[in-house]
Structure formats: structure tokens, C-alpha cells
Amino acid sequence: MNRFPARPLPTLPGALALLVIALLSACAGAVPSLPPSHLPVIASPTVAPSVTPSSVPVASIRPTASIVPVTAPIDELTTIAAAVPAPRDQRAISAAFHGGDIPYVARTMPLDVRIGATETFWVADVSNNVNYTVTAQLRYAGPVVLMYIDTTLDVPQHLIEQSAQVFEERIYPRNRLLFGEERIPGVDGDARLTILNTRIRGAGGYFSSADGVTRAVNRFSNEREMFVIDAVAFPPGSETYNATLAHEFQHMIHWHRQPRSPTWFNEGLSMLAEDLNGLGDNGAALAYLRNPDTQLTTWAPGSGVTRHYGAAQLFMRYLYEQYAGDSRPADWIDADAGNNVHVLANLAAYRRPDIVTFADLFADWAVANALNDPYVDDGRYAYRGIPTRAATMRLEPGTTSATVRQFGVDYMGPLDGPLAIDFDGADTVQLVGVLPAEGRFAWWSNRGDESVSTLTRHLDLRSVSRATLTFRLWHELERDYDYAFVTVSNDGGTHWQTLPGITTRADDPQGHNMGYGFTGVSGAPDVALGGVRGRWIDERIDLTPFVGQDVLLRFWVISDAAINGPGMLIDDIRVPEIGFADGAETDDGGWDAIGFVRTSGILPQRWVVRLLLFDSDETRVIIPEIDNQGRISLRVAAGQRAILLVSGATHFTTEPASYRVNLYQP
């Protein structure tokens, strides 16, 4: 979806939304007159770990390589990393599909507004996946912000002015200092931002990139730099309202500076914006720490979204406290650190050169979430922003088979010595939920937010009287927001015509379907992303209208912001009338691929494993080497207690990693 809500509402499937109000706990105290220069001090953990950390500083045992790739097609990771989708230019896409002279902006002069005047706005109903209009009155017009209030709501004027002034005088300059500037003057020709206060069905607030384009591009656009807040759930004048202002303004800035940033990174910085404005709370963080097997580097719809907010929030708190130094989050945004996580590893390496990969940085954060002891090693395993320690799970003697998410964490313990621990992790993991339909390879669309992947080739249909395109298709895309298309161009690629297939859809509830599009889950058209898994289906498209011509054929996958699925696979592509057949088995088959990549669907499974050892007088973090078959043997001596930490560490996939742990008396 193209909207960034402020916080999660766990009961909403398929969309980001606000946290249930009862879960929110506003930060104590008013907004400080001077913005804080660092994270607010958060209370020390109140829930003790199952083992007692030591106050004796002890260095961790750190070999030169903590993660060893196992036997699998390692080049797949390199190939995928090099296949970068293009950014989504909504205006250019609309022009390519629909033609016409599409303006970049709605106006070039500032809005002519007056207090008391009313305007009509589009609002998203996240629950029912529709858009509707409301009438709102301008109640405040300042140098930075225009505050509109739904005419059906009774909001005291002094509270409107209070929050408007907090935003203009404190949040606005603070966010711009930390995260950079928003788009000015933008689509509306006005440097002022619009904040619409209304009831929102299914969410508590959002920023939508659709509002930043003209209605010629998206008919639901409000043609303003703006965000929307549920003034019933978060009344103006409240701490939660002001926190939402800080949160959504970061999204607005971020979209302008780096629209392709993945949601986990973008949301993490919006949570950090709340913290750095003195408005943060720990509701989502606690949800994550209760369920730490949550993948940091992705974003899932449904009830689990609260944990994703918490993971992103805690990681950014840790990163900012430990490694920000003289850098600003704006620098991380400009470096596209969300898509290039080695940027974050390099940031950490300035202080600690032993951090080589993002997995090393992630592992230190994961240990800190279990330990939070500043006296162990050099202080890397602690930060003030953690409200309690991560939950652990007990292991019984014998062999336990389990799965863990990529960049999620299983904490196992306490484990009492004497004890032997044998770990055996899977060598490989699937890229998506299926393997190629035939042969060893298929074309994968890649995945990402605000991105466009294309696969294009020339087709000579001049010598035939009819033509048919057939192919095998698998997809898991965010329904009604992210679409795949099959198109033909007969003017060299300037304009493209979408083609109907067996499972394409022509309805367009969100203004994103360019004609005939594939969306949702293949084989389950009425199921939202995250419900059931897709399956391979047979597709057939009539090319007869283009016979007698030399044309270009193009597959597209276009995703908006906030949520994305595993993407699309295509295989066994044929136009039998001209003798064309391609199963992605050899080289590029004459295709021009942007974002798309040939894949076997199998990636090497990498691992992060740590053993936290607690003696009577010291705490140690053991970083074992993993052999080339993903195996480790560890020992806990008599009188020691331990926690075993296991994480998957393979990029690009959201499929879980399988492993076995065997506990026995040595």
C-alpha cells in the first residue's frame, strides 16, 4: 500500500495501521522546550533474565569469521544483489500506459486559503480497501502548516493551535535537522504542509505518496504535501497526536529523499523521530521482545505488524546510541542504507573495525537484547532504549527441530552445565515459496517498495496471422496495491498496452492498476497477501491484435510503498506460432532485464549463532565458527548457565531457516 501509518493496529490484515490505543503509553512530560540531542533515557529493564549478567568486563571470544557460507549456489546472492529494480516514477508510468501530457504539479503558486473555508479531501478506508471523501474546515494557517478539521468533529480551537505550534516550533525544525528536508514547494506549489484531522476507518493516521502526484496520475490524490490523522483516536493537543506528527513527517521527508527505502528502515526512522522529539513509547518494542523471532528486514501485514514496528524501533535506538556519532539519519537515508545494509555495517566499523557485515552488526544488537550489560566486552551489548530483555524459550534434552526467521532470533535457555550442544543448520533456503516450474531456472521479478522491475524482448510477428503467448506464472503481491502486467509496445517502447489474461483483473480500487493486471496471490485471487501461499498457474494471452508487426513484449511488476510480497516468477514462456520458447535455462535468452533475475530459487543459508555464558564472576559472549555444513559443537561447563542465540542471516528471502539443536550430557 502507498500509505505509511504512524503505528500498528494488529487487527488489520494487509495494511500498515496504528497500534490499538490501549497499547500506547504516552511518554511522560511535555515536549521539551529544546529538542533532546540524544535518545531519551528509558528505564532499566524491570524483568530479570533467567540468568544473571555479570558486572565484570570480559571480552567476547571473536574469531576472524563468524559466518561461513555453506555449500549452495553462492553466485545467486551476488546476481540478485546486482539486479536493482528501477524507482517508481508514477507520472512516467502513467504516461507510458495512458499517454497524454501529464503535468508534474497541480499548481505553481501557493494555495489561496482562508480560515473557516472548507475543502473536500480523499481519505482511505484501510479496513474495507476503498477511498471516500470528507469535508474539512481550515482552522489554523501558520507559516509551516495548514490544519484542517473534519466538519463532523468538535475539536477545541486551543488544542488545534497548541499542536500546530508544537509542530511548527519544535518537531518541524528538529526532524529537518535530523532527517533532511521535505519536497518544497511540491505538487501544490505551497511550502506549507497540510494536516487533515478526521476519523479514519481502520487506521489512526497515514502519509500517502499518492497525494504527492496529480489526479491525472492517481484519481484519489489530494494534490498536496500532507498527512492524515485520526483526531478521535489521537486528539489534537495530546502526546500521542504530537508523536504521530513527528512520525508521519519523517515519512514525508523520507519519501522525497529516498522513495525506494524498505519499510523496516523507513518505519524504524519514524519511530526514532518520535524518540528524538521526546515522544517515544515502548508498546511496540515490548511486543517484539516477547516475540523476537520476527524478521527485522521485512514488513508483514496482519496482526504481526506490531512486532515489526518494535524490531525496527529497537534496532534504530541501538544504532543511533552506539554508532550515530557525527552522522545524521539523513546521511543513512541518502546512502540508501535500507537497501544497502553494508552502509550500516560500515558506519559501525568506524567505531568497531571487527564489524564486517550487517550480520555482525545484527548479531551484536541481538545479543544486547538478551544481555543489556554495558560491562561485557566494550559496551556493545547494551543500550538505554531497551525496556526489558528478550523472551527465551526452554529446550528439553535430546534433539529439537525448529525454524527461525532470517534476521529474527531464537533465544534458547537457560541451559545449565555440564551440557553439550550440537547445532546443525540447513545448507540452503528457498528464495520464495516455490521452485521453478520446469527445469532449473525461472525469472524472478525481485521485490521492494516504490520499485519497477521489467523484462523486455523483441517479437517479430510479421509472418504470422495469429499469435498466442503462454507462460507459467507464480506471484505473491500486495493485493490492489502492487501489480504485474504483460504489455506490448508497437512504437519502440514509448507507450505500452496492457493485455488481458486468464487471471488478470481490470478493477482498480486504489488507482494503481494500469489496465489488466495481476495482483494478490496466484491461484487464490480472493486471498490477501499473508493468507495462503501462491501456486504455479498456466497463463495465456492473445497476441493476435499485433500480428503483422514488429513489437516489444514486456513483463512488469510495479510496487508502491509500505508493504511488498515475495514478487513474481515466470517460466516456460512461449509463442508457438513463431517458434519462440524460453525457460530461463541459458544466459538471458535475449531479454533486457531491469530488476528481473534468472534464479534457481535456492540460496545459501547463512547463520548467526552466539552462546552467552554466565559464570559466577563473569559473562562471556562466545562467537563460534560454523563449518561448511552449517554445524557447530559447543560446551557449557559445570556451574555455568547459558543462552543459545540462533538467527538466519540470508538476505533477499523471507522464507524461514531450518535447524536442529541436540542437547546431551557430555
Where are these regions (language model features)?
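Acidic/His/Gly-enriched intrinsically disordered linker/tail segments
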Residues: A210, T214-N222, E239, A243, ...
